[in-house]
């Protein structure tokens, strides 16, 4: 399905302590900042949308880190969506594309939404990223009634007993995930890192993931997430779980 990407300046959803141009004036290893976002709207059915979002960028030596978080929303009352496709492009000030990344997820139930977050890296080539273009979509045939399919709603994987342990390279996030659905499932357990925007509201901007496999209906399993993203200057964190 073709998508039309519409660039949009960030307002209350994201915080920018200083313009990217001002950040670039600092020594290269020191720049960091929340950056712009564009969204995509599909044209058929009630298309998947991005309900909320956040992103962050920083440099460590010759490596650029791009982190992102988005709440994917399915407003269809009678159609679940299989294999939602997230596409991300990092763009320069002149509009040229520096780097792209994408991710396929599992089901989004009817009239439901959930958060997903992650990060990717690339080698710095002297061009400072000025913004992010973000899209979410699905193929026409992946809009399907959920009857007879093992589709979980966002609240059916319950995360409890969460804690942050250790420090430095030994930092880890632990807890339990319970499958409250009628189906055996695998889960992506995601720690969402949040930063405050200009209004003081905390917005997810990054995530690290653990995979918990073969969770039977009613079963609870432990998890441990290691912060491989390296993001450390977040204001708070939260852990969620989604079907995979």
Predicted regions: what is each one?
Residues 10, 14-18:
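Hydrophobic core
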Residues 62-70, 167-174:
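Short, solvent-exposed loop/turn segments enriched in Ser/Thr/Gly
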Residues 1-5, 9-10:
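Positively charged n-region of N-terminal signal peptides that target proteins for export
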Residues 79-86, 99-101, 185-191, 204-205:
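Short, hydrophobic/aromatic beta-strand segments
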Residues 72-78, 177-183:
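Asparagine-centered strand-capping/turn motif at beta-strand->loop junctions
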Residues 18-31:
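Sec-dependent signal peptide cleavage junction
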